[in-house]
């Protein structure tokens, strides 16, 4: 990697073994008595684009100017390397070294020193001296003007690229909270030492008596002593030498370039002169004359990244002063203090050097890493600072103290500080706009909103809000005694109202809601009513206690007000002896009158406050009451609707029970005994299904005529045991129309509301029993009537048949004529059965069985009648048959006639 320097200037081997270190150019060791860079800080070759313009002073030094070695130098275990010289004259030796220093035209500014190089960048001249190929002055090479112009153009282009890179959007600082160690161990090896940076270096020569392995302090080979921010590179200690004006001009140019690259904060123009004076003071500074300003064993190398290289274990007690000083200057609202000595050399009062609370280097500019919160004035934004970092930010403390300050004073201080900074640095406007992060803008906006909210709160605190919740939250007035306050606060927790503004807003019944709320549905109205009713019921339990508490608080407030006014009046009257002058007497009387007016106004204020509170409560409850009234109206409307439907159903049931053929239409189930009159057996009973109810309800609507109904609605009313409807017989239409028992309208069927099964169950038990008894009695009467008619028909037939032997032709004609009435009578019988028992007719198989039985009975009766008539005539006195030819030739009598001869 680098060259190991093993005591080439007469240092003992023991000390040299501990002080072996790598030479990587000018940044290897910036200060005599400090450690060099780690191996991570590699010596990479630098192209001309990354270098400084020629002519810039460089602190690289060749070992040619070293004095003769001195013997007897003791070594300490620390890796500090101090080259020996004349211990009696350290100042003269330093001046000699400065005079013999070789200036390099280039300065390393590239980031490539962070990478490790495998090749050495040093060489040895013919005289045996080590030459830094990067930083030391090399033999002049003849370059043409054209090449020089090209080099300058490349340098300018590199500058533009570097500026664009450094000012890119979203660029963060090079420093982060984790970069700077909180405590640096003194036993770190050179390879593990903290990384040094390019700028903000603070060099303090260490007195020879402070290091154990000490000689006179002298610069190391390839390690120029850089001043603060690389802006105070000294070319010669003597002001008479010609290099000083050139060095100052080069420093100005170097500063301008660093400002453009964002590595250095720009300074105001008036500070330039003081900076030059500070540079001279730093060059002529003798650490032996000011031993108290240099901490023991400490030679910090601070930089923009917040990193440092230390030789001593811990800082002295003087170093902890800087954190307090920074905090104090932050409170005063001025930028960080820059005395002439601190600006350039960083050496001044005892508190000018040191570290912050966490052991971080706190130079005048590098120390500004301890940021102040956004509400406090800050120095101009620096490229090397991060607004969102900083482990020792005193933000909460500053914010707490700042919140206690008056608002006007805070705004005045903030405006004055900002204006003063801009006046001191007029050239920073564009620079700050480019660098200001987004977070700063957000914090500024939040601060403005906070100020606005405070102003609004101050304006709104004229009178407290007249509500129970607000009184409970804000507590009792301050003039009450602590015991009374404690008692009231304890008792107040138990009597809080439940119907608060939060509940009203949640239920969307608060009057102060913006805009007109959409109307609530019936379900929402019901939910709101339930919650409000519960809240009202809960409030009713604590109403008396809340009234007593409010009255007691009101009385206490009035009494306290009266006491204060009386005390004020007493204090004025006690000072009546002081009012000697006539004008004073008038003022005295005026004050007494004002006190009386205040007394009356206080009483009126109390009464008006009660009225205002009552009106506000009425306003709060108005929407809630409106919602509850709406719910009651909905209930009333629903009740009227259900009641009307129920009455219609009862009326329809009564009408159906009064009909002779009501069971075919009303759908009311009949009992088993009413159905057993004709068939002799029980039919299965079924409840009327819900699907039947709409057709049933549509049969009896107001305004309908009894004969305006159509019969297709009837099949749904009759159900068979298997659930299949039977079509009505066409012959049933005239009978139904004659009796006028159907009065449904198909047009009204769709519009009629469908009654649910619950409406059927709402019928009283008495109505059901009465309807069943009426149906049973009517069925019984009709059954008896039909049975009687059948018996009459049979008797008539028998009478006619008995007369047939005397009048054979008439009997034959009457038999032919009776065929038609018999068929019609059968049809009437089937129709009667269908009307009486609709469920029986729904099954076609039962109908055919009944028809077959009737037909067989008719045939049997006919055969029986004809047989009897012929047998009686054969037994007559003439001894011969008098049957007619039709009877003899008929198919039922032919068999009998064949059987008679065989029997005779």
Swiss-Prot record:
Naming one, the record's GO cellular component terms include:
endoplasmic reticulum membrane
Pfam families recorded: MRVI1 (PF05781)
By its UniProt entry, which PANTHER family does this protein fall under? INOSITOL 1,4,5-TRIPHOSPHATE RECEPTOR ASSOCIATED 1, LYMPHOID-RESTRICTED MEMBRANE PROTEIN, JAW1
What's the name of the protein?
Answer: Inositol 1,4,5-triphosphate receptor associated 1
Q: Where is the composition biased (Acidic residues)?
A: 794-818
Q: Gene name, please?
A: IRAG1
**Compositionally biased intervals (Basic residues):** 103-114
What does the record give as the function of this protein? Plays a role as NO/PRKG1-dependent regulator of IP3-induced calcium release; its phosphorylation by PRKG1 inhibits bradykinin and IP3-induced calcium release from intracellular stores. Recruits PRKG1 to the endoplasmic reticulum and may mediate the assembly of PRKG1 and ITPR1 in a macrocomplex. Involved in PRKG1 signaling cascade leading to inhibition of platelet activation and aggregation. Also mediates NO-dependent inhibition of calcium signaling in gastrointestinal smooth muscle contributing to NO-dependent relaxation.
């Amino acid at each position: 990697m680098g060259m190991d320097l093993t005591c080439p200037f007469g240092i003992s081997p023991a000390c040299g073994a501990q002080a072996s270190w790598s030479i990587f150019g000018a940044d290897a060791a910036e200060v005599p008595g400090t450690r060099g860079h780690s191996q991570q800080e590699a010596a990479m070759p630098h192209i001309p684009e990354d270098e400084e313009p020629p002519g810039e002073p460089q602190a690289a030094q060749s070992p040619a100017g070293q004095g003769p070695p001195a013997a007897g130098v003791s070594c300490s275990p620390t890796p500090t390397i101090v080259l020996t010289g004349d211990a009696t004259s350290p100042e003269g030796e330093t001046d000699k070294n400065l005079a013999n220093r070789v200036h390099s035209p280039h300065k390393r500014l590239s980031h490539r020193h962070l990478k490790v190089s495998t090749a050495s960048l040093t060489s040895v001249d013919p005289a045996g001296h080590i030459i830094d190929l990067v930083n030391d002055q090399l033999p002049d090479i003849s370059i043409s003007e054209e090449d020089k112009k090209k080099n300058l153009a490349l340098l300018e282009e590199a500058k533009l690229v570097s500026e664009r890179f450094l000012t890119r959007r979203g660029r963060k600082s090079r420093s982060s909270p984790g970069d700077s160690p909180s405590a640096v161990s003194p036993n770190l090896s050179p390879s593990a030492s903290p990384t040094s940076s390019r700028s903000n270096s603070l060099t303090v020569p260490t007195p020879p008596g402070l290091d154990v392995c000490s000689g006179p302090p002298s610069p190391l080979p390839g390690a120029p002593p850089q001043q603060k921010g690389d802006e105070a590179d000294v070319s010669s200690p003597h002001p008479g030498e010609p290099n000083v004006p050139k060095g100052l001009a080069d420093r100005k140019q170097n500063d301008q370039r660093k400002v453009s690259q964002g590595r250095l904060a720009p300074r105001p123009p008036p500070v330039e002169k003081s900076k030059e004076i500070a540079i001279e003071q730093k060059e002529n500074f003798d650490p032996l004359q000011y031993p108290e300003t240099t901490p023991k064993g400490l030679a910090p190398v601070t930089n923009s990244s917040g990193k440092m290289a230390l030789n001593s274990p811990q800082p002295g007690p003087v170093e902890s002063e800087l954190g307090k000083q920074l905090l104090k200057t932050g409170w005063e609202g001025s930028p960080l203090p820059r005395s002439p000595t601190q600006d350039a050399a960083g050496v001044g009062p005892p508190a000018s050097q040191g570290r912050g609370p966490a052991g971080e280097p706190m130079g005048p500019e590098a120390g500004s890493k301890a940021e102040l919160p956004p509400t406090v004035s800050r120095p101009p934004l620096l490229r090397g600072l991060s607004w969102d970092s900083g482990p020792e930010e005193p933000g909460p403390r500053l914010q707490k103290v700042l919140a206690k300050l008056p608002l006007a004073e805070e705004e005045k201080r903030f405006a004055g500080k900002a204006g003063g900074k801009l006046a001191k640095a007029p050239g920073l406007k564009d620079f700050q706009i480019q660098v200001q992060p987004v977070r700063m803008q957000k914090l500024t906006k939040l601060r403005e909103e906070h100020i606005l909210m405070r102003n609004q709160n101050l304006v709104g605190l004229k009178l407290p809000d007249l509500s129970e919740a607000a009184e409970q939250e804000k507590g009792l007035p301050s003039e009450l005694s602590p015991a009374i306050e404690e008692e009231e606060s304890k008792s107040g927790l138990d009597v809080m109202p439940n119907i608060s503004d939060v509940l009203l807003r949640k239920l969307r019944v608060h009057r102060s809601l913006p805009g007109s709320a959409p109307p609530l549905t019936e379900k929402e109205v019901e939910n709101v009513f339930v919650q409000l009713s519960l809240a009202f019921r809960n409030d009713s339990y604590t109403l008396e206690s809340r009234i007593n508490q409010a009255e007691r608080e009101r009385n206490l407030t009035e009494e306290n007000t009266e006491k204060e006014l009386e005390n004020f009046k007493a204090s004025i009257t006690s000072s009546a002896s002081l009012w000697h002058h006539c004008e004073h007497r008038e003022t005295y009387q005026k004050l007494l009158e004002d006190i009386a007016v205040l007394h009356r106004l206080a009483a009126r204020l109390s009464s008006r406050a009660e009225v205002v509170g009552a009106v506000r409560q009425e306003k709060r409850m108005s929407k809630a009451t409106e919602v509850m009234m709406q719910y009651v109206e909905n209930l009333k409307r629903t009740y009227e609707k259900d009641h009307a439907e129920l009455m219609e159903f009862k009326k329809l049931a009564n009408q159906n029970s009064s009909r002779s053929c009501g069971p075919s239409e009303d759908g009311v189930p009949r009992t088993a005994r009413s159905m057993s009159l004709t068939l002799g057996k029980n039919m299965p009973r079924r409840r009327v299904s819900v699907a039947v109810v709409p057709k049933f309800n549509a049969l009896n609507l107001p305004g309908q005529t009894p004969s305006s109904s159509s019969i297709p609605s009837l099949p749904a009313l009759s159900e068979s045991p298997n659930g299949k409807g039977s079509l009505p017989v066409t012959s049933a239409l005239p009978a139904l129309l004659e009796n006028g028992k159907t009065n449904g309208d198909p047009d009204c069927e769709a519009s009629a509301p469908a009654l649910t099964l619950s409406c059927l169950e709402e019928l009283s038990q008495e109505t059901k029993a009465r309807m069943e008894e009426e149906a049973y009695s009517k069925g019984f009467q009709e059954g008896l009537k039909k049975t009687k008619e059948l018996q009459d028909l049979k008797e008539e037939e028998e009478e006619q048949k008995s007369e047939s032997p005397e009048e054979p032709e008439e009997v034959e004609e009457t038999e032919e004529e009776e065929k038609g009435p018999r068929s019609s009578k059968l049809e009437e019988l089937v129709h009667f059965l269908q009307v009486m028992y609709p469920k029986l007719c729904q099954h076609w198989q039962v109908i055919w069985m009944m028809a077959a039985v009737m037909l067989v009975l008719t045939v049997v009766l006919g055969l029986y009648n004809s047989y009897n008539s012929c047998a009686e005539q054969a037994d007559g006195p003439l001894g011969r048959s008098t049957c007619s030819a039709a009877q003899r030739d008929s198919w039922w009598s032919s068999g009998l006639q064949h059987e008679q001869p065989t029997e005779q």
